[in-house]
Amino acid sequence: MPNQGEDCYFFFYSTCTKGDSCPFRHCEAALGNETVCTLWQEGRCFRRVCRFRHMEIDKKRSEIPCYWENQPTGCQKLNCAFHHNRGRYVDGLFLPPSKSVLPTVPESPEEEVKASQLSVQQNKLSVQSNPSPQLRSVMKVESSENVPSPKHPPVVINAADDDEDDDDQFSEEGDETKTPTLQPTPEVHNGLRVTSVRKPAVNIKQGECLHFGIKTLEEIKSKKMKEKSEEQGEGSSGVSSLLLHPEPVPGPEKENVRTVVRTVTLSTKQGEEPLVRLGLTETLGKRKFSTGGDSDPPLKRSLAQRLGKKVEAPETNTDETPKKAQVSKSLKERLGMSADPNNEDATDKVNKVGEIHVKTLEEMLLERASQKHGESQTKLKTEGPSKTDDSTSGARSSSTIRIKTFSEVLAEEEHRQQEAERQKSKKDTTCIKLKTDSEIKKTVVLPPIVASKGQSEEPAGKTKSMQEVHMKTVEEIKLEKALRVQQSSESSTSSPSQHEATPGARLLLRITKRTWRKEEKKLQEGNEVDFLSRVRMEATEASVETTGVDITKIQVKRCEIMRETRMQKQQEREKSVLTPLQGDVASCNTQVAEKPVLTAVPGITWHLTKQLPTKSSQKVEVETSGIADSLLNVKWSAQTLEKRGEAKPTVNVKQSVVKVVSSPKLAPKRKAVEMHPAVTAAVKPLSSSSVLQEPPAKKAAVDAVVLLVSEDKSVTVPETENPRDSLVLPLTQSSSDSSPPEVSGPSSSQMSMKTRRLSSASTGKPPLSVEDDFEKLTWEISGGKLEAEIDLDPGKDEDDLPLEL
């Protein structure tokens, strides 16, 4: 066939993208023509425009219906060679339907195979075949050869019919033994399968079958398969009989492990078809007979054997369940429960075969739950015996009630833990809230502390009624010990303080430091109950002045006691600094003794009646609300300035004094406090007995109040400081104001310059001469170490650390 002048296939049927560079012929006149040019076939067609096709016809397209005709858009090709049943419009031209008639009888061998497939699927013949695509190639080979017109045509069953074919396989195959399904078959060569001849229910010799051109190879393969099946059937006859996969006589060909075995029957005898159908019934009858006469129960038994004998399990359980019931009885007897009627019911129900599993499961659940409750009773002693008895009785009654009570017990424990955490979080938040509150809380809280020292035995009965006793933290225990040590130390220091009352402020400094030293040594001692009663009594007494928020007061006291312990070592360091100046301080005792005395009684709060601005006020008025209702105008005579040659009638102690005493870290907190209009100072005496019996202690309290009150109206007792450090540090200043600068060195001069800058930057209200002189004198007395001692507290004991956490 000459290649020259051959039509382009893509141009003829679709679109050629090569255009003029295509070596094949592009002739529009030949489009859609199904007549082959004879001259072109002979190689003698030299016409430029030949309206016949120069291409062999492999298919009769005029007899094949057009695919695009059934699509929504329809066939839009002008020269479509396929058959059209309906007319169509293409580019405005009407094309009539095709004149040729579709053939009803298939003429090509492939169409015969398709027709045979349809007929076999409809009739569902009992002839099995392989659904694999390899078989189709085999069938093409068979059909291409000259096979006489088969009355039983070769059959290919698609994979979509697997379920139906499986049913046919089980029903058709007889009782002959067969190898298990999952065995590899080496008979698949190069993707091709050879079908075998099989005549069911009758053992037919191979020589009786008709042999076609392929059948010689098939016969050889079938013999090999038969030999292998016999060898494997001997070894696994029992297993194969249980698996219910019998093997046909010639031996089926398997494609691979994943496919189901099928065979194709080819025959030319006319009497074979009724034999095949008779074979179906016979094989069914033989199968029923082979399984034991009756059809259903033996089949179930064989299935149970396939599944591992699970049907026999209830029979064994009937023997085992009474043992379980006895075990449960022994468990209940061990737990000491009277469950005899339940056990009798259980033993009666065990005898009933149908209810065995459910009843034993419930009993086992009941026993486990009751056993868990028996163990949990020892752990949950706080629940009480009545609750545990109720839970065990509920456990006997029903499993749901028992599970409820057990979960309720767990829920109660979790609820308790949540309440404890809530209390802790409330205590922590109240300490934080105290920093933003005004000092009214301190005035309310501190006097009951003083009052409780003399009345420590009274509130013991009241604390028992309080329900907060259970929620004790480590901090509260430490605070209890601290207050108890404080009470014992005050009672012990009352007698030596009476003897030292006459010397004055110098001995007063010693008394305070000695008291705090003893408290610091005895911080880890004491009883917890005394503190608890004291704290509760303080809270109840303070309820007269406040709304009765006891937890807030306790937290205030806790923070104050923490600050007290923090300032103890600072006072000891101050004492070491002030000891060389005690001789100078003694000269000031006469002047200090002339000051008006304020009697500090337990429960008395110190209120500022008048808030004086720093510029204009030169007098500080302190009102005692308990005993002395008169206003005492405490005037600072020029004690510190007389020795320095400055004669002023009164010295207004400015805000810079307190700023020197307190740490610079408190400056933002003072600014936060400036928004509160009321300024109150709470002075806590060292002890009720010592205050009542010591005039120097009263003078020291007056000095502390004067120093605290003489601050600016925006400055109050800082919340991070303790009232006691405000009591002690101003005492050191006021008592040692008149001392000459003997200890002043380079460090003190540097610190004085620093504080001058700090005070001038912080407030520009007071005159700088008085402020700077007073600050310089203060820093010379302290040796420049006062700020460092207040800011940094490096030498804290291990006992102080948990109080600060």
Swiss-Prot record:
Where is region (Disordered) located? 139-194, 223-351, 364-433, 449-468, 478-506, 715-805
| Comp. bias intervals (Basic and acidic residues) | 364-390, 412-433, 455-468
| Low complexity: bias regions | 486-498, 734-749
Biological process per Gene Ontology, one example term: poly(A)+ mRNA export from nucleus
Query: Which organism was this protein described from?
Result: Homo sapiens (Human)
Annotated keywords: Metal-binding, Repeat, Zinc, Zinc-finger
Which SMART domains has this protein been placed in?
ZnF_C3H1
Query: Which Gene3D superfamilies does the record match to this protein?
Result: Zinc finger, CCCH-type (4.10.1000.10)
Which residue windows are coiled coil? Answer: none
Tell me the first and last residues of the signal peptide.
none
Name of protein: Zinc finger CCCH domain-containing protein 11C
Biased segments, Polar residues type: 391-402, 750-763
Zn finger (C3H1-type) ranges are 2-29, 31-57
| Ranges annotated as biased composition (Acidic residues) | 160-175, 789-805
Which Pfam families does UniProt cross-reference here? zf-CCCH_3 (PF15663)
Chain's gene name = ZC3H11C
Metal-binding: present as a keyword of the record? yes
Molecular function via GO = zinc ion binding
